[in-house]
């Protein structure tokens, strides 16, 4: 049978999602816990998105195959009892063999939280990005609006990105001032490697006056990663939702509704 899970994790504790020889990744820890519940059998998970080291998930979706018959609650409470405190399974659903956590998804959502304050916060360390002064949010919003739609996002793509095409449909890019933070909410059919962090980094340059909103259009048109500002820190980035067709009957389009930092 095939089981889908909704999970959340604090990325500070791990070297990213994808399995590594040293074993300190979210996937490694989850596979081991699931394997124990499955009767000490090997379990391999597949995720909607492969988050980098330091990146968090308020709602990641994974699936795995198993011939172990267990109540769904065992894949939640039982697995959570074996996971470190930085990872939690939120829900479990049995799905058909035609479901794939990555390839069945038609959209993904991310949020980036940025603290703009002269002094960094030790209490929010690793949970938010930080910049030492206030930013021109109006200019950032103007620049963000120019990125909406279907474009070649090569200028905001990591050099090691393995996506077949750099063309993505960015459907939402909102910048919200809330609880003393800036929150960037992004929604697209899919994202390139480092795309969110590269967009946030470029918008920060607009906010501090190093780039104009018109410059963002030039960066987009250049289709050249070397023409854009550096990749911004991973600390404030959260995978917050994955969209699937209704036929799979997964919870609320798998969106995280409880993400608040303050």
Curated annotation (Swiss-Prot):
Residues bound to substrate: 110
Keywords annotated in UniProt: Isomerase, tRNA processing
Keyword Kinase part of the UniProt annotation: no
Pfam families found in the cross-reference section: PseudoU_synth_1
Reaction catalysis annotation: uridine(38/39/40) in tRNA = pseudouridine(38/39/40) in tRNA
Family annotation (HAMAP family): TruA (MF_00171)
Function text: Formation of pseudouridine at positions 38, 39 and 40 in the anticodon stem and loop of transfer RNAs.
Family membership noted in the UniProt record: Belongs to the tRNA pseudouridine synthase TruA family.
Subunit structure comment from the entry: Homodimer.
NCBIfam families documented for this protein: hisT_truA
Protein's UniProt name: tRNA pseudouridine synthase A
Provenance organism: Chromobacterium violaceum (strain ATCC 12472 / DSM 30191 / JCM 1249 / CCUG 213 / NBRC 12614 / NCIMB 9131 / NCTC 9757 / MK)
Annotated gene: truA
